[in-house]
Design a protein with these regions (language model features):
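Beta1-alpha1 glycine-rich phosphate/pyrophosphate-binding loop at the start
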Residues: 2-88, 184-229, 276
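Glycine-rich, N-terminal phosphate-binding loop of Rossmann-like dinucleotide-binding domains
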Residues: 15, 100, 124-125, 266, ...
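Short glycine-enriched, charge-decorated loop/helix-capping segments at active-site entrances
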Residues: 53-61, 137-141, 233, 291-293
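A conserved short coil-to-beta-strand element within the FAD-binding core of flavoproteins
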Residues: 83-95, 250-261
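Core beta-strand elements of the Rossmann-like FAD/NAD(P) dinucleotide-binding domain
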Residues: 106-119, 265-274
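Glycine-rich dinucleotide-binding loop and its adjacent helix/turn
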Residues: 124-185, 194-199
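FAD-site-proximal beta/loop scaffold in flavoenzymes
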Residues: 138-167, 261-263, 271-274, 278-300
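Internal nucleotide-binding/catalytic subdomain
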Residues: 212-292
Length: 300
């Protein structure tokens, strides 16, 4: 567990895009040359670039063809990968505490341990922020991980198979998708789903008419979609989405999510069988309890 004597110990917590890139660069420049000992701590076994999660959700790409194995990446690039999730920090002793890892049967893979450091980099990324909206945890899917995206895709396929096989007419909102939040993730998912649903139906699900039966609602609380981008880009994207048949609804704040759809602030209900929450992010909650670190209301 210890670095070679005398080497500067750099510990990076979090193997997202930033953490993995940093570990790789430091490993190549300092780790390989024996000038520092680089350790990346991450609970996942593989890395997937989050901006492509909407493509997994739509079924456009296979996650296993686009994932990077942490063990292999560390071996090739001069750093050490250690599986686990940070649970605490002792700043006085310069120790990162890491919890035990269990397999799918509940058996221990690794025990909890403390990793010493000289330089600590926190690159833990973000988590979904549902702003306390009722029903989000129970009835919506947030695309945080490849598992989330694959779960959404399975539900989408099952919904289409169910609709094709049922003898009764479609219920209100059946096959509809409500995407809450019109940032980059929401906009890209809406466009990708338009193509994906039509491809799926073309596989002999002829009882479903995608133009008639499938509605994609893109709901944004703010005055326009893509609020982080220039207005001209947002306007162009809005026009393109509307041409695809996506129902773009700015100024539509969601107050609750239920089993049959979402409730808007004005009292209107949007019926939907599938709901995706893409409305906001915050830093992981455990940061608020770390030794001596100050955080704001979203744990930054």
């Amino acid at each position: 567990m210890n670095a070679p004597s005398g080497l500067h110990r750099i510990v990076i917590v979090g193997g997202g895009a930033g953490g993995l890139e940093l570990a790789t660069r430091l490993g190549r420049t300092l780790g390989r040359t024996g000038r520092a000992h680089i350790t990346l701590i991450e609970k996942a076994r593989t890395h997937f670039w989050k901006p492509h999660l909407h493509e997994i959700a739509a079924g456009s790409i296979d996650v296993h063809e686009h994932a990077t194995d942490y063990l292999a990446q560390s071996h090739w690039n001069g750093f050490r990968y250690r599986v686990g999730q940070m649970t605490g920090l002792d700043r006085a002793q310069r120790l990162v505490h890491v919890g035990p890892v269990l397999d799918e049967d509940g058996r221990p893979v690794t025990q909890g341990y403390a990793r010493p450091y000289d330089t600590l980099v926190m690159a833990v990324g973000s988590r979904t922020n549902d702003f306390g909206t009722p029903g989000v945890a129970e009835h919506a899917i947030a695309l945080e991980t490849p598992d989330d995206a694959e779960r959404f895709h399975r539900r989408l396929v099952n919904a289409c198979l169910r609709a094709h096989m049922q003898a009764t007419p479609l219920a209100p909102g059946q096959l509809n998708v409500a995407i809450i939040g019109a940032g980059a993730t929401g906009v890209e998912l809406a466009a990708e789903l338009h193509k994906a649903t039509r491809t799926l139906v073309s596989y002999n699900l002829e009882r479903i008419d995608p133009e008639r039966d499938i509605r994609i609602h893109l709901l944004e609380a703010g005055p326009r979609i893509l609020p982080a981008l220039p207005e001209r880009i947002a306007a162009s994207a809005t026009g393109l989405l509307m041409k695809l048949g996506v129902k773009v609804r700015a100024g539509s704040r969601v107050t609750a999510v239920g089993a049959q759809g979402v409730q808007l602030a004005g009292g209107e209900r949007v019926d939907a069988e599938l709901v995706v929450w893409a409305a906001g992010v915050k830093a992981p909650a455990f940061l608020a309890g770390l030794d001596g670190l100050e955080t704001n209301r979203i744990n930054q």
